[in-house]
């Protein structure tokens, strides 16, 4: 029998971790190659990573950044969104979505989510549009695409910008088109739990040359030239700054890792899809458990596997979480709704009741999911749920 995996949070083994980063020998080799370079940031490996990422997503331009939060923030700033403006975001999302809006001086407006996939509700978007609304940030939750056709129509009819939060969705498509290409920008995360990791990192994609040039400047203090341009043409100190920028760069080492991971992403996503199918098959007939089945799973990056604990299951979500811990299995919740955080109670606006997010929050639970997960590990998870019925 295979030995238990190490727990990332405690110095001991665990039966089933929540996630295991997919780092193999080829990734380590890619990192080693980057370390031999004399240029460890803003160099040729980043350019190649951006080029290949652009090709993979079908976008014209890709801009590597330090993380997805900075990707969102730069996108908002590049679109001129700031103080006095409102940006519609889903109530169930990671806090970074709200923080990026707040950093610009704009106000996040919390919209409700769909019962069937936890993506932002189209009806809720419609209700929350005001004279101050400047943009919508749809979050492709767990890897399932939002209804981008409807969101694009709302945006066009109301002269709004779209910034896609694709942190969960590398490989996700809507109508055969990669997410992130429907809005002004698409923002991706390379955090260790994501489908592609650079430890920390992110990427912005856009179809606009003007926006791409502006984003490259903004990520590097507002400087108008790249390092290569500065040191190969004229004097390296002779550059201009026309706007306030940030230090949101991504280095060559992480770019090399990301470039290598990108070569494997289709295979890794297929493994995730297979794991989701196995969970669905074994969980959908358990009384009190509701699974989120996606009929277009091949277009879903399957970043998370979320179940809903119904009232007839016998115990609460929190008690089930504790049962998993007792059995050496880590689970989590994605996410605590934004309206429940102290900061956002004061900083965000809620124009209409968030009925669905409020009702779903005590019910949802994310089960272990990663490309390397085995059937034995998934069976351990399934057994805990089945035993609760006895």
Report residues per predicted region.
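N-terminal "arm"/small-domain region of PLP-dependent enzymes with the aminotransferase-like
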Residues: 1-39, 44, 240-242
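PLP-dependent aminotransferase class I/II
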Residues: 5-8, 46-51, 59-63, 123, ...
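Phosphate-binding glycine-rich loop
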Residues: 39-86, 100-104, 110-112, 177
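Structural detector of well-ordered beta-strand residues that form the stable sheet scaffold
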Residues: 63, 88, 109, 162-163, ...
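PLP-dependent aminotransferase-like
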Residues: 77-166, 173
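Conserved active-site segment immediately N-terminal to the catalytic lysine
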Residues: 164-198, 237-242
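Active-site PLP attachment segment
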Residues: 181-225
């Amino acid at each position: 029998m295979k030995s238990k995996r190490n727990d990332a949070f405690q110095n001991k083994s665990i039966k089933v971790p929540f996630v295991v980063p997919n780092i193999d020998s080829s990734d380590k080799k890619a990192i080693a190659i980057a370390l031999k370079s004399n240029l460890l940031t803003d160099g040729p490996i980043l350019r190649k990573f951006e080029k290949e990422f652009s090709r993979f997503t079908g976008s014209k331009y890709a801009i590597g950044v330090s993380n997805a939060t900075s990707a969102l923030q730069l996108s908002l700033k590049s679109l001129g969104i700031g103080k006095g403006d409102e940006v519609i975001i889903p109530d169930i999302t990671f806090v970074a979505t709200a923080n990026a809006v707040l950093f610009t001086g704009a106000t996040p407006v919390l919209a409700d989510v769909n019962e069937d996939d936890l993506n932002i509700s189209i009806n809720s978007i419609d209700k929350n549009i005001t004279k101050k609304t400047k943009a919508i940030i749809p979050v492709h939750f767990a890897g399932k695409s939002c209804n981008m056709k409807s969101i694009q129509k709302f945006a066009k009819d109301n002269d709004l910008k779209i910034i896609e939060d694709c942190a969960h969705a590398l490989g996700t498509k809507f109508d055969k088109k990669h997410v992130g290409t429907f809005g002004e920008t698409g923002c991706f995360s390379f955090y260790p739990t994501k489908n592609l990791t650079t430890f920390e990192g992110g990427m912005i994609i856009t179809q606009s040359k003007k926006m791409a040039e502006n984003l490259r400047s903004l990520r590097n203090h507002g400087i108008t030239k790249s390092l290569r341009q500065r040191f190969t043409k004229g004097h390296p100190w002779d550059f201009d700054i026309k706007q306030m920028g940030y230090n949101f760069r991504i280095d060559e080492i992480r770019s090399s890792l990301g470039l290598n991971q990108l070569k494997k992403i289709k295979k890794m996503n297929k493994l995730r899809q297979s794991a989701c199918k196995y969970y669905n098959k074994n969980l959908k007939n358990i009384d009190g458990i509701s699974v989120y089945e996606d009929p277009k799973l091949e277009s879903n990056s399957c970043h998370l596997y979320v179940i809903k604990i119904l009232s007839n299951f016998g115990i609460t979500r929190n008690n089930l979480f504790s049962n998993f811990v007792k059995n050496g299995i880590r689970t989590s919740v994605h996410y605590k709704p934004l309206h429940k955080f102290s900061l956002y109670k004061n900083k965000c606006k809620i124009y209409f009741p968030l009925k669905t997010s409020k009702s779903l929050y005590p019910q949802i639970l994310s089960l272990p999911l990663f490309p390397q997960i085995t059937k034995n590990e998934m069976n351990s998870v399934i057994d805990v749920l089945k035993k609760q019925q006895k």
